Regions:
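Low-complexity, Ser/Thr/Pro/Gly-enriched N-terminal "stalk/linker" regions
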Residues: 154-201, 225-228, 232, 325, ...
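Polysaccharide-binding surfaces and accessory modules of carbohydrate-active proteins
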Residues: 1-92, 134-166, 293-301
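Short Pro-Gly-centered flexible turn/kink motifs
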Residues: 10, 113-131, 365-368
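Active-site acid/base region of carbohydrate-active enzymes
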Residues: 170-182, 233-234, 238, 264-265, ...
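Non-catalytic C-terminal accessory modules of carbohydrate-active enzymes
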Residues: 458-463, 476, 488-493, 508-662
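Aromatic-rich carbohydrate-recognition surfaces in CAZymes
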Residues: 218-334, 359-362, 366, 449, ...
């Protein structure tokens, strides 16, 4: 939209511009992209007949304006040795209408505008694609007219307002409200789950553990999607119990690896979905397995398209198979094998000879087994529940016997038996996720839990830079080879920078311990809005302050600089930290309660929770002397829970917590 406020007539051009990829990498595909123009609609078209999976598809770019100039030649548009900062086309009145094969393909449409003083103008550009030429042109025709664009934009706004309305908060911290009420769910659902793409990585693949974690963060806003994704992931499990590390739809090509944690996210996810929704029917859904050749000892993994297996099983059976595999692949200390990396893919050579063991994975497996006990009992499988109890207890004993280093928990053991994340190490003496998950899993004895988090806070929280390191000191000169993590500059990304995923887990662990001061301190460090409060901070952080960044650098001269924004799973975990760990949402089926971990200076906050067509409006105060009280529409609820009813009503909930000390 343009509004001429200059006080005189202006002659302008509005130019819409796209660069065609039509494949995975533009450098590979551009020689195969052929462009043309449909004379009836004026749409510029592009196709890549050599695309392995999408050879028949065609894309279009067009506008409703008349008298337009256009070109499909990027060289013509930007000029020789030119750039998009100052395209050569802007120095000419008309584009040269070049199209066909053998060009550096693009689509540029130049709309001439003549605006008298006070005039307004609106130009709409459309970008789309169809399965073939006929469908593409039909789509282009059906979307002609400015009203189509306006209606589509309105529909998008209505959709997102509906999704984001599930949980809304009003707290004394406006930076928290901005993230919790919109940006984090939008980042998780829009970028991570639907697009699976970002400026730092435009991949499009489903990562088994990656999008499962995203879907679990969406269980309040989109439980249907969480359910659907559990079944999708189960359909990418091999008959041996391992899974595809990632795959590209729609064909399903991807990688099979010896990564040791992927498959355990399936039972972990099933447990969370049932804990929150109470929907046990998903466990009886029947899903097929896949088959493929085994990963050889000489490989970390291989890329291929698996074949569907004749074997099928319920989601419950898929989860059990994953747990059995996890409990079978143990090392000499009775802890899970590291394989070609656990959650930290960069530690891909710690245990690639199938002898190295992962302490973090021991905590994670214990947590998953512990959660599965209740699920198995509810499913009527008491023997499996007992088996989970025995396996979890064995893991707990082995972790407490072998993993404690004296002041914190170790991270792993190399294939040769050397420890990692130990005071014996010159590099990576302490790793964050072993400390946080020792608490989150319930393994650590109380005194060790406190000491482990104290060590994390002392050694990894950088108050000067407002960041939380993943590990310290970074890998640099060590004789042991941990893997490709050492390829990062010390202090960057996983190699000693802030890896925000792990930073959030640290804050969650402090909240679980009831340490509100440190939990909120760390949450404030992670919140990107707090890294852009003044021009100096903006110049330090240098990335978008409204979405989570996967990394914050911890090495001079880039200390405090963010990296890898948007496409990071830390967004979903940050959402869970804010609305669950800190503001205290606890939903168990049709029961909802709040158990917040609040700063002492907060007198109150408000929270709205949507259940179906109903809304529950919480007002949380802190004036109670003695026991907390909860009223729903004035009626006392002795168990401090709210019964959720999908009846279209607005319920008023008053929760009065005990007054803070002092």
């Amino acid at each position: 939209r343009l509004h001429n406020l200059s006080g005189r007539t202006r002659r302008l051009s509005a130019i819409g511009y796209v660069e065609w990829v039509m494949g995975d990498l533009r450098a590979k595909s551009r020689m195969h992209v052929v462009t043309e123009r449909d004379h009836q609609t004026g749409a510029l078209l592009a196709r890549n007949a050599y695309s392995t999976d999408f050879g028949g598809r065609m894309a279009f770019f067009d506008t409703d304006a008349d008298g337009c100039g256009w070109t499909c030649d990027r060289l013509e548009f930007i000029g020789r040795n030119g750039s998009l900062h100052a395209p050569a086309a802007l120095r000419r009145e008309r584009l040269d209408s070049r199209l066909g094969a053998g060009l550096d393909p693009c689509a540029a449409i130049q709309v001439p505008l003549l605006l008298a003083a006070g005039d307004r103008s609106e130009t709409t550009f459309r970008l789309g694609a169809g399965r073939n030429r006929k469908e593409t042109l039909a789509l282009a025709r059906s979307r002609q007219g400015a009203h189509e664009a306006i209606d589509a934009l309105d529909a998008v706004r209505i959709h997102w307002r509906n999704v984001l309305a599930t949980v809304q908060v009003r707290t004394p911290d406006p930076a928290l409200d901005a993230l919790a009420n919109g940006w984090l769910v939008y980042q998780t659902l829009g970028c991570r789950y639907l697009a699976r793409s970002g400026y730092y990585q435009s991949g499009g693949a489903f990562g088994f553990r990656d999008q499962l974690q995203d879907a679990l963060a969406l269980v309040h806003a989109r439980p249907d999607l969480t359910r659907e994704h559990l079944l999708l992931c189960a359909a990418h499990q091999f008959t041996e119990g391992d899974v595809m590390h990632w795959w590209h739809p729609p064909q399903g090509r991807g990688v099979r690896t010896r990564c040791s944690d992927d498959y355990l996210w399936l039972p972990q996810g099933a447990c969370r979905y049932l804990e929150v929704t109470g929907d046990a029917s998903v466990l009886d859904e029947v899903v097929g397995y896949i088959e493929g050749r085994a990963v050889t000892p000489e490989e970390e993994g291989y890329y291929d398209m698996p074949t569907p297996s004749t074997q099928r099983g319920t989601l419950y059976a898929h989860c059990v198979l994953a747990l059995e595999r996890g409990c079978r692949l143990l090392g000499e200390r009775g802890l899970p094998l590291m394989g070609s990396g656990d959650w930290n893919d960069g530690m891909n050579r710690v245990g690639d000879q199938q002898r190295g063991e992962s302490v973090w994975l021991g905590f994670f497996l214990h947590d998953t087994l512990r959660r599965f006990i209740g699920l198995a009992n509810a499913h009527g499988d008491a023997p499996r529940a007992e088996w989970c109890q025995q396996q979890a207890e064995s893991l707990r004993q082995n972790l407490e016997q072998h993993a404690w280093d004296g002041a914190w928990y170790r991270r792993a053991w190399f294939d040769n038996g050397a420890p990692l994340g130990s005071s014996q190490n010159q590099e990576c003496r302490i790793d964050s996720i072993s400390q946080s998950w020792s608490v989150l899993s319930g393994v650590a004895a109380p005194e060790r839990a406190t000491q482990a988090l104290d060590s994390l806070y002392t050694h990894l929280v950088r108050k000067d830079a407002q960041l939380i390191q993943l590990l310290d000191p970074p890998f640099d000169q060590t004789t042991e080879d941990p893997g490709y993590i050492r390829g990062y500059v010390p202090g960057v990304r996983e190699n000693g920078g802030q890896y925000t995923h792990a930073a959030v887990w640290a804050a969650m662990a402090f909240a679980q311990q009831g340490d509100a001061v440190r939990a909120w301190e760390l949450a404030g460090m992670i919140n990107p809005l707090n890294h852009a409060l003044d021009p100096e901070a903006v110049q330090t952080y240098r990335v978008e302050p409204y979405v989570l960044a996967a990394d914050v650098y911890a090495v001079s001269p880039h200390v405090g600089r963010g990296g890898w924004t948007w496409y990071t799973g830390s967004a979903g975990w940050m959402y869970r930290l804010l609305v669950e760990s800190l503001l205290g949402i606890r939903r168990e089926g049709d029961r909802l309660s709040l158990a917040p971990c609040l700063p002492d200076h907060w007198p109150s906050f408000e929270l709205s929770y949507r259940f179906g067509r109903s809304f529950y409006e919480f007002v949380v105060t802190r004036t109670a002397q003695g026991q907390a009280t909860l009223h729903v529409d004035g009626m006392l609820q002795p168990d401090l829970t709210v019964l959720l009813r999908d009846d279209g009503h607005h319920y008023r909930v008053a929760l009065d917590l005990c007054a803070p000390p002092g």
